[in-house]
């Protein structure tokens, strides 16, 4: 497990500052691959670890992040802080309920951590956005890196969209009822796309028998009517016998029933979630060696490893790693 970011060492007295003030005062730098970033306060993150994480993002992705600057701060607070000691020059009475200012803690304290959030987006004006990431809420490099990469992935998808090669693969996997997903958002939107409850378990495929083991499963097989395929001579008229018409109707109904009605809005949300998840996991794999099981959560079953590997290979082909970084999928041998 990666080293902890919660060092437990004494730190200076923490105070709160408006996020916009941090953005104004902190020295913004740019990594060699083009990520704009800054640090503020007692982050607990070593410079080498931060550089390794930032430089893992392929240049083909950073080109779409021009509007974002990533601020690594001890704690970014999620909401109003009336009960906390705020030290800034703004009048205490000037607290509009609908637009509370985003606040940042200069160091970790238990009190501030109760109101902190993993990250907070702040509009800085002129089309620029600050993404304030709470480094001291993360237990280790794995958690911090994944939080950063998730934010990068969402920003990238918002700007670049979803490649057809990826969406085709993912939708094919969904049609085949592949086990699990990459996030609760992808899991729920996939279920909703097929008209299932958000937390439903997809129906298992019928087990194959010896007779049909090598055939295409019924959910993707093309339905054919049992009409004659004989050629009709030119100038003649084809007349279906009374016995054939019910067969055609039944075949048409069977074909329609075999194709589930798809909610296109939820389908789009599913593909977007699956793509941003896969980009984030791909970036994480470039920055760190980790076991796939570390991504497991209770709310949904984890995507089958072979299905994830297929998605990540598409991502790697689209956005090759930067120099000194390598993408690899290694399968663990069963004991």
Where in this protein do the model-derived segments appear?
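Post-HEXXH active-site segment of zinc metalloproteases
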Residues: 142, 146, 158-206, 210-238, ...
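Pan-zinc metallopeptidase signature
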Residues: 1-32, 209, 218-219, 223-227, ...
